[in-house]
Design a protein with these regions (language model features):
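Charged, solvent-exposed interaction patches on well-folded alpha/beta domains
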Residues: 1-54, 67, 71-80, 88-91, ...
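Extended, alpha-helix-rich binding/interface surfaces that flank or overlap catalytic cores
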Residues: 58
């Protein structure tokens, strides 16, 4: 007995065909909307003032003025927030030795927010009339008259050549001295007047109260700082007179 061929349901065929047509029309409509949106956005970006830069905000800059940073970044050359080259601007600002890191962010529709991270000097490399601000890694931030930044410890330069601003000091003993200063809490570092990197015992400091601090190489610094803080607190609270403090072996 022969099987009868099943005739396709015309309603199903019509439904399938209609669904495909609807899908194609929807896709076409979406493409048109995307293209129209892109065209409108392009027009707004390049041919209107919809994204014109109206405000530039700086944060974190204490030693470099906003005006200096604007000039470094060439901000006057850019008027459009969307097309502004944030990477190039950041790199240009980082050419200033004070500037360690820059983050440039757009805040639509009209604002640029620029966060500055400045280098932090821990000592003043002293050459009598002139001095160099040094970071704890030996980076020379700037050259200043030696009577400025009196809150910073003076680091004896010895026979080490004056550094080039924007480069690092290479002398190992000086680097050890700076590492010690950088590893101290701010409150402890503020008690120091001078530092001698070239003492045979390692970095030795003169406090603002006149006694010496024999610190030694930058090892066990957390423990050394704790011991030193405890001794200085005791000296202050009990009005003791001392000639020196030796924390080379803190235990």
């Amino acid at each position: 007995m022969k099987r009868l061929k099943r005739v396709p349901d015309s309603r199903r065929v019509l439904f399938a065909g209609g669904w495909l047509r609807a899908l194609k029309l929807t896709a076409l409509a979406l493409i048109i909307l995307v293209l129209a949106g892109a065209s409108l956005l392009t027009f707004m970006v390049f041919f209107t003032s919809a994204f014109k830069i109206k405000e530039i905000n700086f944060s974190g800059n204490a030693n470099v003025s906003a005006e200096q940073l604007k000039q470094l970044g060439g901000m006057d050359a850019y008027s459009n927030l969307v097309t502004m080259p944030v990477g190039r601007i950041a790199r240009s600002m980082e050419n200033n030795p004070w500037v360690k890191d820059v983050k440039v962010q757009r805040h639509l529709p009209h604002t640029v927010n620029i966060a500055i991270v400045e280098r932090k000097p821990v000592g003043l490399f002293d050459y009598t009339s002139d001095a160099y601000l040094l970071e704890d890694d030996g980076f020379a931030i700037g050259k200043v008259p030696s009577d400025q930044f009196k809150e910073l410890p003076r680091v004896y330069a010895g026979e080490v050549p004056a550094p080039v601003v924007g480069s690092k000091v290479s002398d190992k003993k000086v680097l050890d001295c700076l590492a010690v200063l950088g590893g101290m809490p701010q409150k402890l570092r503020d008690t120091l007047l001078m530092g001698n990197p070239f003492d045979g015992r390692g970095p030795v400091f003169v406090s603002r109260n006149g006694y010496n601090v024999v610190y030694g190489r930058p090892t066990q610094m957390s423990r050394k700082n704790e011991v030193l803080e405890a001794i200085l607190t005791d000296v202050k609270n009990n009005n003791r007179k001392i000639a020196y403090v030796d924390v080379r072996i803190p235990d």
